From Swiss-Prot:
Cofactor: K(+)
Binding site for (6S)-5-formyl-5,6,7,8-tetrahydrofolate: R23, E88, R127, K461
Similarity annotation: Belongs to the TRAFAC class TrmE-Era-EngA-EngB-Septin-like GTPase superfamily. TrmE GTPase family.
Protein name: tRNA modification GTPase MnmE
NCBIfam families to which the protein is assigned, alphabetical: mnmE_trmE_thdF (TIGR00450), PRK05291.1-3 (NF003661), small_GTP (TIGR00231)
Gene Ontology terms, MF aspect: GTP binding; GTPase activity; metal ion binding
Species per Swiss-Prot/TrEMBL record: Alkaliphilus metalliredigens (strain QYMF)
PROSITE patterns listed in its UniProt record: G_TRME
């Protein structure tokens, strides 16, 4: 990528809309727009004060064609999104106007922007760091209000500031270590070792605090993969319909109606759920149903959360017991349905098998217990804590991996200090921790990783 050229792209979604926006960034942005834009007052944009919206038309002078009626804004660098000169053309929405305007801009000397290149330039030009750049994509793809708020906080630098503070503390450690190494002809005193150990352990705690938020952050970013399991005709499809508040799955009294998994994406109290209603798990000779059962088991193994449904009106069957044994090692909710009927189920046996898992009594036909189910989901995701809008969460898997590597290196450093190993070994561990944290903010990343990150962005962002 060349920062000295001028790029252009359509910045709005494809399709019919009220307006469309074409964005230009680079040192030739003003020169290019003045070749194609005619303002109503007849002035060139270079003769109009920046940060004003100017009415006029986009004209293809070579073909003597008026392309569209537009509003154009010019923002002079460095106080822009990319820190470069930026022009935005607001035209009529739809595929044709933006496409024709972009083609004209490219003919006048701009280059078609790569995916995420505007944000990448903002990063490379120092306006934002890499964590903030990634937050832009999280903001665009947020599935819930909470996810949006967390992304906005990261865009404003909440994670970056926390990571930078830890990195600065690691630099202080490195300074102490290097001074001690410079005087290597003298023994390292206990005071120095105690100080380094104290610093290391305090930084360890801070990294662990960040890592503890990663599971919740991942759910807010990607959704909670939740699988409803149970034997046939226990109410799995009815639960899916009740949570969706619409009839999505077929509900009958015939066991085995759901032959394949049904997947829905929706929000419950700000939690994005990827909810999968699976075929009932049982022994069957039906080939199609058997395939569905095998798929159910595959979804079960990959799930973040299992919702196991049992039938209160029947005694526990070998199938129930088999599924409960599988659930023991997973994060799970146990829902006992059909509590409106005479109870035949052994609750003590359920508790004996699943242990501390939450057991909720519900009746889908009477619509009772659903609120408690929603509350349990919130408790599982937020681990019983109340999350404020300005909560700092680690939502990016790349950030989590970097924090884990930093923690591992720092833990090695702590052990080296405790064992009174040469400080050169400690220095390597502390430097590795610093490098790992630098990957979050972009201080220690290569071009290949940057390309990989930004290729997932939208064109025009």
């Amino acid at each position: 990528m060349f920062l000295d050229d001028t790029i252009a792209a359509i910045a709005t979604a494809h399709g019919e809309a009220g307006i469309g926006i074409v964005r230009i960034s680079g040192e030739k942005a003003l020169h290019i727009i003045d070749q194609v834009f005619q303002s109503k007052q007849g002035k060139k944009l270079k003769d109009i004060s920046p940060r004003r919206i100017t009415y006029g038309h986009i004209i293809d002078t070579e073909r003597n064609e008026r392309i569209d009626e537009v509003l154009v804004s010019y923002m002079k660098g460095p106080h822009t999104y990319t820190t470069e000169d930026v022009v935005e053309i607001n035209c009529h929405g739809g595929m044709i106007p933006v496409k024709r305007i972009l083609e004209l801009i490219l003919r006048k000397g701009a280059r078609a922007a790569d995916a995420g290149e505007f944000t990448k330039r903002a990063f490379l030009n120092g306006r934002i760091d890499l964590a903030q750049a990634e937050a832009v994509m999280d903001l665009v793809s947020a599935k819930t209000d909470m996810g949006f708020d967390v992304a906005l906080n990261q865009l404003e630098g909440s994670l970056s500031k926390r990571v930078k503070k830890v990195k600065d503390e690691l630099l202080d450690m490195l300074a102490h270590i290097e001074v001690s190494i410079d005087f290597s002809d003298e023994d390292v005193d206990e005071v120095t070792l105690d100080l380094l150990l104290k610093q290391s352990m305090e930084i360890e705690k801070k990294i662990k605090v960040l890592l503890e938020t990663a599971d919740t952050g991942k759910i807010l970013r990607e959704g909670l993969n939740t699988v409803i399991v149970g034997k046939p005709n226990v109410g799995k499809s009815s639960l899916l319909n009740a949570l969706l508040k619409e009839s999505r799955a077929i509900v009958t009294e015939v066991p085995g109606t759901t032959r394949d998994a049904i997947e829905e994406h929706f929000n419950i109290r700000g939690i994005p759920l990827n909810l999968i209603d699976t075929a009932g798990i049982r022994e069957t000779e039906d080939i199609v149903e058997k395939i569905g059962v095998e798929r159910s088991k595959a979804f079960f193994n990959k799930a973040d959360l299992i919702i196991l449904m049992l039938d209160a009106s029947r005694e526990l069957t070998p199938e129930d017991l088999q599924i409960m044994e599988l659930v023991k090692s997973k994060k799970a909710l146990i829902l006992v349905n059909k509590t409106d009927l005479t109870s035949q189920i052994d609750y003590d046996r359920i508790i004996e098998i699943v242990g501390e898992k939450k057991v909720i009594k519900i009746s889908l036909i009477e619509e009772s217990g659903l609120e408690e189910v929603e509350e349990a989901l919130v408790e599982i995701v937020y681990k019983g804590e109340t999350r404020a809008k300005d909560s700092l969460l680690v939502t990016n898997v790349r950030h989590k991996n970097a924090l884990e590597r930093a923690l591992e290196s720092l833990t090695d450093g702590v052990q080296a200090i405790k064992q009174k190993m040469p400080l050169d070994f400690v220095e390597v561990d502390v430097k590795n921790a610093w490098d790992a944290l630098g990957e979050i903010t972009g201080d220690t990343v290569g071009e290949d990783l940057l390309d990989h990150i930004f290729q997932n962005f939208c064109i025009g962002k």
